[in-house]
Amino acid sequence: MEFEITSDTRNELLGRRELRFILTYDGATPSRKEIRGKLCALNNINENLVVLDSLRTGYGRMQLDGFMRIYDTEEGRQRTERSYLLNRGEPKKEEEEA
């Protein structure tokens, strides 16, 4: 996996960085969890502060375009982001059988 950051802007009002990137990969499309982990390792940030918003692949390309937000604090992330984006890419919780 190779990352190329195409845009890195700072949003002071919401206390976050907004990154647009291009990911080049071999084989199957990587999962959101793999992408988030790799980007966090490269930028030396905590995974709890990151939200992957969109990942777009093109037909026949081994490349995807993505958009992610990196928050300054966990509270800012919880306050600003929609709940489905926070849960996206996480394993579903098993319902208890009664």
Swiss-Prot record:
| A Gene Ontology term for the protein's cellular component | ribosome
Concerning InterPro entries, the annotation shows: Nucleotide-bd_a/b_plait_sf (IPR012677), Ribosomal_eS24 (IPR001976), Ribosomal_uL23/eL15/eS24_sf (IPR012678)
Name this protein carries in UniProt: Small ribosomal subunit protein eS24
Q: Where is this region: Disordered?
A: 76-98
HAMAP family (alphabetical)? Ribosomal_eS24
Q: Matching SUPFAM superfamilies, A to Z? A: Ribosomal proteins S24e, L23 and L15e
Annotated signal sequence range: none
Family affiliation? Belongs to the eukaryotic ribosomal protein eS24 family.
Q: Name one GO biological process term.
A: translation
Gene Ontology MF term list = structural constituent of ribosome
Q: Which organism is it from?
A: Methanosphaerula palustris (strain ATCC BAA-1556 / DSM 19958 / E1-9c)
Which key words tag this protein in UniProt?
Ribonucleoprotein, Ribosomal protein
**Top-level taxon in the UniProt lineage:** Archaea
Q: Where is the composition biased (Basic and acidic residues)?
A: 89-98
State one Pfam family annotation.
Ribosomal_S24e
